[in-house]
C-alpha cells in the first residue's frame, strides 16, 4: 500500500481510501454481510436481465424498464463494492487519480439515472392502474425509448459537471480520503482551492433532481392509492397495497438516503464520519439486492419466465 502524501507541492497521482476511521477493527466483520448482499444483488439482477432477454412474453415496456433498472444496479455494484471489499480483505486502499474520478462519474451518473428510472416506472404503474384502457396506447416501446433517452440526457446534463468540478481543483491537503469511495465532497475537501461552488452545485442539483423525482413518485402513488381503495373485490385491495406499498417503500429508501447523504456530506463536522460512509455503502447494496425481488420475483410473469428458463437448461 502506498504511503500517505503530505507534500503540498507534489501533484496527487493517487488517493488512499480510509474506510470507517473510527471503527477500523470492525471492517473484517462487516465484509461478510456486505459480500452476501453483493452476491445476492449481482445474482438476482443478472437472472432478471437474462430472463427478460430470453423470454419473449416479457418483451413489454414494463419489463424493458426493469431491465434498465437491473443494468444500472449491476454497474453501480461493480463500481463500488469490489473496491470496498478489497480494502476490507486485503488492505488495498490506493486508487489512482483517474480511477477515482471515473468511479465518481459512474456513481453520480447511474444514481441519477436510477432515480429517474424509478420515476418513469411509477408513471407506468399510474397509467396501468388509473387508466388501464389507455395503457397500451400510452406506454409503448416508443415511450420506453424516449424515456431512456431522457434518462441519459438528463444525467449527462446534470451529473457530468460533478467529477469535472472536482478534477479541476488543485490537491495539496494530502491524499487520504476518509471514505470507502470517491465521493465528490470527500475528494474535493482535500483541495487547497475554494470548494464552495462544488458544495453548492451538489446540494442544489441533488435536491432539485432527487426531490422532483420523489415528488412525482409520491403524486403517482397517491393517485394509485386512491384508485386501489375503490376496489370492491375481496382481497384485491390488500394485494394491490402489498405490491405498490413495497415498491413505494423501496423507492422512498433510495431517494431519502441520497438526500440524507447530500446533507451529511455538507454537515460532516456535526455528524460522526462513519455514518455517511456506512449509508453510502448500504445505498449501493440494499436497493440493488431488493429491486429484483420487489419488482421482479414477486411478479407472476417474471416467476413464470424464470421457470421456463430453468426448464430449458
Swiss-Prot record:
InterPro entries for this protein: GPCR_Rhodpsn, GPCR_Rhodpsn_7TM, Olfact_rcpt, OR51/52/56-like
Its job: Odorant receptor.
Coiled coil: none
Protein family (similarity comment): Belongs to the G-protein coupled receptor 1 family.
Cytoplasmic side: 50-57, 124-142, 221-240, 298-313
Subcellular location: Cell membrane
Statement: the UniProt record of this protein carries the keyword Glycoprotein: yes
PANTHER family, per database record: OLFACTORY RECEPTOR 56A4, OLFACTORY RECEPTOR 56B1-RELATED
One GO cellular component term: plasma membrane
Protein's membrane topology: Multi-pass membrane protein
GO molecular function annotations of the record: G protein-coupled receptor activity; olfactory receptor activity
Ranges facing Extracellular side: 1-28, 79-102, 164-199, 262-276
Annotated glycan sites: 6, 184
SUPFAM superfamilies documented for this protein: Family A G protein-coupled receptor-like
Protein name: Olfactory receptor 56A4
